[in-house]
């Protein structure tokens, strides 16, 4: 299993880092078999697998439950777990206790925090306490309730400078990596070159040190629409939906199960069953 020191070396050597989300045992198993470098148990699970319209309702118990399943499916892959909405915006002590709970109970190797500002101090204190932290700047889904959109961030000179300053701040605080989401590719390239820690892009161009995409987006599973930055490598819904419809049709028509799908017993053992022929 790769560790933070390996990710630093990959950046230094120009080797791209691959990260894929996973939310359960089978998806984690798939990701590990694909030899991805990292797994992100994102609070995006709230929208992707729990059916919420945002990440806000996701709880710590949700994140722990899903991370434990992921760990069983991918025991040899570095796992990063999101700290969900408002679990790191109270006191430093509360943040440390919440991170401790996630790491100890789920087995996650690192936690991910969105944003900067007061979050920078939380990253520093978690790092001091021995908890690896991945930072996240640009489009931060937990803040969409305030911003009101999933549009590209940091397109103006002022916003770009602010993001650069924040990136340098989270690095100085001790973050082991930085996710850059939905920002101009030119800015992502400059940030990646300015930092010594790896950058993981999603909708941030090819010049980041690595890339992350959602498992379901990659394979086309349960997706109603894809963002511009997503490439579809498969569309398994096209196979799943007809398969399920065929099952329903065959059960209704009594053509499933066939004899080959059934178990049998000797006829003589049936005779006199319960005293009846």
Curated annotation (Swiss-Prot):
Residue ranges the record marks as coiled coil: none
EC number, as in UniProt: 2.1.2.11
Top-level taxon of origin: Bacteria
Compartments where found: Cytoplasm
Quaternary context: Homodecamer; pentamer of dimers.
Binding-site residues for 3-methyl-2-oxobutanoate, renumbered to this chain: 43-44, 82, 112
Cofactor: Mg(2+)
Gene name of the record: panB
GO biological process: pantothenate biosynthetic process
Protein name from the UniProt record: 3-methyl-2-oxobutanoate hydroxymethyltransferase
Gene3D superfamilies recorded: Phosphoenolpyruvate-binding domains
Binding site for Mg(2+): 43, 82, 114
Pathway the protein acts in: Cofactor biosynthesis; (R)-pantothenate biosynthesis; (R)-pantoate from 3-methyl-2-oxobutanoate: step 1/2
Family of this protein: Belongs to the PanB family.
Any one Gene Ontology molecular-function term assigned to this protein's record: magnesium ion binding
General function of this protein: Catalyzes the reversible reaction in which hydroxymethyl group from 5,10-methylenetetrahydrofolate is transferred onto alpha-ketoisovalerate to form ketopantoate.
Species in which this protein is naturally found: Listeria monocytogenes serotype 4b (strain CLIP80459)
Swiss-Prot/TrEMBL keywords: Cytoplasm, Magnesium, Metal-binding, Pantothenate biosynthesis, Transferase
Pfam families xrefs: Pantoate_transf
Cofactor binding note: Binds 1 Mg(2+) ion per subunit.
Broad EC category: transferase
Single GO cellular component term: cytoplasm
Residues at the catalytic site: 181 (proton acceptor)
Catalyzed reactions per annotation: 3-methyl-2-oxobutanoate + (6R)-5,10-methylene-5,6,7,8-tetrahydrofolate + H2O = 2-dehydropantoate + (6S)-5,6,7,8-tetrahydrofolate
